[in-house]
Amino acid sequence: MTTASTSQVRQNYHQDSEAAINRQINLELYASYVYLSMSYYFDRDDVALKNFAKYFLHQSHEEREHAEKLMKLQNQRGGRIFLQDIKKPDCDDWESGLNAMECALHLEKNVNQSLLELHKLATDKNDPHLCDFLETHYLNEQVKAIKELGDHVTNLRKMGAPESGLAEYLFDKHTLGDSDNES
């Protein structure tokens, strides 16, 4: 493996921040991979909840875009991208829409915690550019995603999921199906 050359554009970009960005890239790609797994689980003929599938596919694409945005930042700041292996999702069988939404909520909270730690590191290293980048592109979006998933979990539970298959079918049709009109 060749060693990375020194960047001529690097300024006020700490090595710890560079390493943390690379870890965040991996986490965002992992989240994308998990959502992709969820999407194609709900697309199976024996599950057949197409709006759950669409919802999670959209989330997968969004997480991949987050990783790409961080990669672009890494290059702009003069850092070097070092990709790691992406861990396999913990599940292959997501069991139910409720279980998948609960797992997604847990995942988004983990991503958010990692972003908060990255922001703290940027603050500690006196890197206002990285702080601004995270505040502008990530932190508020994470809070919104966590709230949306929390609402979905609450509504699925209120409807009697996962015991009631009808609950998940109706949620798929009327809640996630409606999201097509809002996007």
Swiss-Prot record:
Fe cation 1 binds at E28, E63, H66. The modification N-acetylmethionine is found at M1. It catalyses: 4 Fe(2+) + O2 + 4 H(+) = 4 Fe(3+) + 2 H2O. The modification Phosphoserine is found at S179, S183. It comes from the Eukaryota. GO terms for cellular component: autophagosome; cytoplasmic vesicle; lysosome. Fe cation 2 binds at E63, E108, Q142. Residues 11-160 form the Ferritin-like diiron domain. One of its GO terms (biological process) is iron ion transport. The modification N-acetylthreonine is found at T2. GO terms for molecular function: ferric iron binding; ferrous iron binding; ferroxidase activity. Disulfide bonds: none annotated. It is found in: Cytoplasm; Lysosome; Cytoplasmic vesicle, Autophagosome. Its EC number is 1.16.3.1. Coiled coil: none annotated. Its main location: cytoplasm. CDD domains: Euk_Ferritin. Keywords: Acetylation, Cytoplasm, Cytoplasmic vesicle, Iron, Iron storage, Lysosome, Metal-binding, Oxidoreductase, Phosphoprotein. Stores iron in a soluble, non-toxic, readily available form. Important for iron homeostasis. Has ferroxidase activity. Iron is taken up in the ferrous form and deposited as ferric hydroxides after oxidation. Also plays a role in delivery of iron to cells. Mediates iron uptake in capsule cells of the developing kidney. Delivery to lysosomes is mediated by the cargo receptor NCOA4 for autophagic degradation and release of iron. Oligomer of 24 subunits. There are two types of subunits: L (light) chain and H (heavy) chain. The major chain can be light or heavy, depending on the species and tissue type. The functional molecule forms a roughly spherical shell with a diameter of 12 nm and contains a central cavity into which the insoluble mineral iron core is deposited. Interacts with NCOA4; NCOA4 promotes targeting of the iron-binding ferritin complex to autolysosomes following starvation or iron depletion. Belongs to the ferritin family. PANTHER family: FERRITIN, FERRITIN HEAVY CHAIN. This is Ferritin heavy chain. The gene is FTH1.
